[in-house]
Amino acid sequence: MSVRVRLAPSPTGNLHIGTARTAVFNWLYARRHGGQFILRIEDTDRERSSPRYTRNILAGLAWLGLDWDEGPIYQSNRIARYQAVVQQLLDQGLAYRCYVSEVELEAMRAAQKAAGKAPRYDNRHRFLTEEQRRAYEAEGRQPVIRFKIEEPLEVSWVDLIRGPITWNTQDLGGDMVIARADGYPLYNLAVVVDDIDMGITHVIRGEDHIGNTPKQILLYRALGHEPPQFAHSPLILNPEGKKLSKRDGATSVAEFQQMGFLPEALKNYLALLSWSPPDGEEIFSLEKAATMFDFDRVNRAAARFDWNKLNWINSQYIKQLSPAELVERLTPFWQAAGFDLGSVPDPTWLEEVACLIAEGIDRLTEAPPLSRFLFQEPLSYSLPALEQLRLPGVAEAMAAMATTLAAAELPQPVSADSLKPLVEEVAKSQGMKKGLLLKSLRAALTGDLQGPDLMASFALLQRRGWALGRLEAVQKVVA
């Protein structure tokens, strides 16, 4: 039997990080077993579904590189199929028309709450006579369709992550609605029909769906099909153990992309949320993970989102990029910061800038502020940098550095090593400690006291033709 799994997001919001983790698990399991990964868009909620959310979901999955084998299949294109199944269940006496109004349902729930009971539908319209049905219809009532749930009955399955689970039908809230009054199907019915028609063998989803599973198993049986195997992965919580929310920084894949995370790093981290590879490695491609993925190594406990770990993983992937790849990934962020990339000396210069700052960043968004001094002229100075330049003897030392630089015959292209003797010469001629000179040189060239490697930065600025001017500008800056 070929493994067939599916990801079935609802386009009622952007691609959530929890859905992305579910997508990763489905993709890994399908690839591990040489199966198929199907994408289904569950867009039957006409009030909340939106094409822009569908586009966001598709774009997010594509950015992550989670390729699907079939789909996207849209539930909204299959309404007639669901309605035919509803009619089949009605014809078989397994479902019925329920005319209970919303007001009556609210009164029923209020009475149950007052009696200390859990709210549930009391199946009051399961055995209506034809005369009673006609009377309700004469009132203008439009019925929903409810599926009969026999009670008491135990529904059991062996969850591939959580082990044996048993649910009593008395805890399912009574006969469930499977179609609205307008004929549109509800979630549990549409999901079961789709999974049957698409030959889904394994349903891998979040544990928040466990309560739907017994209802769906009953529908599978009513339709004459064996249910697929289920695997319910633990939820993703914030570092404090609470539900992940906007307050935690980001919840959608698009936000992580905008924050400067690489898709390879985010996939890697999502795979590690509740799962661990047998070799204990933390940096791996999804293709490698697919050779090791197994539900036996998925933890049942809720996963806590660890920003520090994600940042570290992302930094490792940034360091692995080639110079050309670094430039490609950084370009959108540089452009968003307003940097003119067309005015740089040459492509090699841009690659060297990328490699220089890659060592000091966890996210791509950190690159523009760290490299701003290499792209923007005139230079702006931080207050600590100005204070450094105003120290006794510093302005004179920078003037000497400018004179020495202007007179030097430097090999082309200028390198950090070719500039180091000039620094030694000025430190000696000015009687200044090298540490003080270097700190002052950083302030003069970069406008700050912290940043990437100073001599490499010096060389890049010299190749751009900006180093001499910045050294000469110190006298005016401190005046």
Swiss-Prot record:
GO CC, alphabetical: cytosol
Broad class of where this protein is predominantly found: cytoplasm
Pfam families, alphabetized: Anticodon_2, tRNA-synt_1c
Disulfides per UniProt: none
Motif 'KMSKS' region, chain ranges: 243-247
Record PROSITE patterns: AA_TRNA_LIGASE_I
Top-rank EC class of the record's enzyme: ligase
GO-annotated biological processes: glutamyl-tRNA aminoacylation
Motif 'HIGH' region location, chain numbering: 9-19
InterPro entries tied to this protein: aa-tRNA-synth_I_cd-bd (IPR045462), aa-tRNA-synth_I_codon-bd_sub2 (IPR020751), aa-tRNA-synth_I_CS (IPR001412), aa_tRNA-synth_I_cd-bd_sf (IPR008925), Glu-tRNA-ligase_bac/mito (IPR004527), Glu-tRNA-synth_I_codon-bd_sub1 (IPR020752), Glu/Gln-tRNA-synth (IPR000924), Glu/Gln-tRNA-synth_Ib_cat-dom (IPR020058)
GO MF: ATP binding; glutamate-tRNA ligase activity; tRNA binding; zinc ion binding
Top-rank taxon, per record: Bacteria
Key words, A-Z: Aminoacyl-tRNA synthetase, ATP-binding, Cytoplasm, Ligase, Nucleotide-binding, Protein biosynthesis
Enzyme nomenclature, EC number: 6.1.1.17
Recorded catalytic activity of this chain's protein: tRNA(Glu) + L-glutamate + ATP = L-glutamyl-tRNA(Glu) + AMP + diphosphate
PANTHER family: GLUTAMATE--TRNA LIGASE (PTHR43311), GLUTAMATE--TRNA LIGASE, MITOCHONDRIAL-RELATED (PTHR43311:SF2)
Family: Belongs to the class-I aminoacyl-tRNA synthetase family. Glutamate--tRNA ligase type 1 subfamily.
Primary role: Catalyzes the attachment of glutamate to tRNA(Glu) in a two-step reaction: glutamate is first activated by ATP to form Glu-AMP and then transferred to the acceptor end of tRNA(Glu).
Designated name of the protein: Glutamate--tRNA ligase
Organism encoding this protein: Synechococcus sp. (strain JA-3-3Ab) (Cyanobacteria bacterium Yellowstone A-Prime)
Gene that specifies this protein: gltX
